[in-house]
C-alpha cells in the first residue's frame, strides 16, 4: 500500500492527515513521500504524524481534526440535563484477589451498580456485568455523584456494535448524525472515544476525555497535540487520575471545570483552509 493508490491525483488539499505507527513503513515509501511533497504543506491531525513527515523532509504542520468544525452545523444553544458516558475507560486485571474484592464491593453498592448494569451496553449476563462494573463505579464515583452515574445514558461506539446493528453506510451516517445531535445538547459527555470528544469541543459541550495511561504506541500516537485540548481522566494502575482541577460532578447546574478554548484556533484555521480551497477550485 502507498498513498498514491488511495488518494486522488488531481486538485487536492491534505488536512487532518494521520499515519498510525503500525502503518508508517507502508505509508512512507519513496513514492508516497514524493506525492506528499507535491501537495505540501500537509495538515496533520496529530503531532506524531507531523513529526514523521518533517523527518522525511515534507513540509507539515499540526492542523487538528476536522471534527472540531462540526459546531458550525450542529452546535445547539439549547442544552438538556442529560449526561452521556460513551465507552468510559476502565480496566480490571482479574485474578482471585480482584474477583473477591469486586464481589465484596458489589455487596455494599449493589443497588447503584445494578441500575447502571441494566442499561450498560455490554452483551454479558447481568451478574457478570455487575461484577465488571465494580471497577468502573469504584473509581468514577470519586469524580461523579451516585445520581449522575445512575441516571446517565451509556453508549457504545465500538465497531462491533455498528456492524451488528447497521447494514449500510447510509444507516451508519444516519446514526452518526443522531449521536452528534445528542452530544450537542448534552449537559456533559465523558468518553474514551476521540471522535466523540473532539466534536463535543467543537459544539461547546462540556467533555471529559478518559484514557488508558499505559496504552500502546499504536494507540497513543493518535493523540499528540489533541490530548492537550481536553480535560483528561487517566486510568493508571487501577485508579483514575485527573489532569485538571475537578470537584465531584453532581446534579447542580454548574461544574468546577470548563473546556479548554485552544481548539477554537484550530477549528477556525481548518474552516478557513477548506473554504479557501473550495473557492480556489472554482476559479
What are these regions (language model features)?
Residues 1-283:
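Active-site anion-handling motifs in enzyme catalytic cores
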Amino acid at each position: 500500500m502507498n498513498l498514491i493508490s488511495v488518494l486522488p491525483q488531481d486538485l487536492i488539499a491534505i488536512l487532518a492527515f494521520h499515519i498510525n505507527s503500525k502503518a508508517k513503513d507502508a505509508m512512507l515509501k519513496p513514492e508516497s513521500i514524493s506525492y506528499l511533497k507535491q501537495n505540501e504543506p500537509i495538515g496533520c491531525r496529530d503531532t506524531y504524524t507531523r513529526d514523521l513527515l518533517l523527518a522525511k523532509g515534507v513540509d507539515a504542520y499540526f492542523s487538528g481534526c476536522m471534527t472540531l468544525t462540526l459546531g458550525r452545523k450542529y452546535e445547539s444553544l439549547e442544552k438538556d440535563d442529560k449526561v452521556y458516558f460513551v465507552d468510559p475507560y476502565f480496566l480490571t486485571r482479574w485474578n482471585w484477589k480482584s474477583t473477591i474484592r469486586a464481589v465484596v464491593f458489589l455487596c455494599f453498592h449493589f443497588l447503584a451498580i445494578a441500575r447502571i448494569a441494566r442499561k450498560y451496553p455490554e452483551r454479558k449476563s447481568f451478574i457478570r456485568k455487575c461484577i465488571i462494573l465494580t471497577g468502573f463505579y469504584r473509581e468514577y464515583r470519586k469524580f461523579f455523584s451516585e445520581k449522575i452515574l445512575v441516571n446517565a445514558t451509556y453508549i457504545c461506539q465500538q465497531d462491533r456494535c455498528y456492524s451488528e446493528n447497521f447494514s449500510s453506510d447510509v444507516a451508519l451516517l444516519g446514526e452518526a448524525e443522531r449521536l452528534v445531535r445528542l452530544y450537542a445538547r448534552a449537559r456533559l459527555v465523558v468518553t474514551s472515544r476521540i471522535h466523540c470528544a473532539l466534536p463535543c469541543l467543537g459544539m461547546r459541550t462540556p467533555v471529559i476525555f478518559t484514557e488508558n495511561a499505559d496504552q500502546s504506541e499504536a494507540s497513543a500516537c493518535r493523540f499528540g497535540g489533541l490530548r492537550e485540548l481536553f480535560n483528561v481522566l487517566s486510568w493508571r494502575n487501577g485508579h483514575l487520575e485527573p489532569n485538571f482541577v475537578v470537584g465531584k460532578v453532581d446534579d447542580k447546574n454548574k461544574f468546577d471545570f470548563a473546556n479548554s478554548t485552544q481548539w477554537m484556533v484550530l477549528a477556525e484555521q481548518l474552516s478557513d483552509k477548506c473554504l479557501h480551497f473550495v473557492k480556489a477550485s472554482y476559479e
